[in-house]
Amino acid sequence: LIYVDVKCGSVKVKPHSSAGALAEVGGQAIKNIEMLITRNKNLKAANWNILASSWPTRNAPQQMTERIRLLRGARFSAPNQETRERAVEQAWEIVAQRRRSSRVQKEVWIVSANSFSATHFEIQLNKGHNGSQESLQAYQLIQSWISTANSNDVDLKIFVSV
């Protein structure tokens, strides 16, 4: 069971390794670990009331009709709103069932595209205390997230720009 939080930056040049850029997406993902581990069958996502609507929004230039892409191992496309709403209920029941199971591996994926550079981060960390303070703060933030994830038996994966 994987919780994915994605934020795409808009820098025109290669991104650096700012703690702020990473915190924007990662903080949200870590805050939502509860969605992966709770035994509360009735706990719904904060965006529950919009899961049956198009994504990202009705006014977006590129829009996907379905937020649910796969259901029970098959590609999903609803012929009408009633079917779409029923699919959201079915999908959420699967999530609720799996998150209660200790046999199901849980992961949080933090995707910080075009806003955080792994190369810049590594260069700054190799400078030790002379590295960028923002990068050193990002390191501390990542360590905190790893600790939180580990204490909840959740794997953490972070995807960033090169």
Each language-model region and where it sits:
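Generic detector of bulky aromatic hydrophobic side chains
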Residues: 12-14, 94, 101
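Long, compositionally biased intrinsically disordered regions
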Residues: 59-66, 70-72, 76-89, 97-162
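Conserved catalytic cores of phosphodiester-cleaving nucleases, focusing on short active-site segments
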Residues: 1-11
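Catalytic cores of nucleic-acid endonucleases
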Residues: 9-56, 108-111
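Amphipathic, oligomerization/interface secondary-structure segments
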Residues: 22, 27-34, 39, 81-95, ...
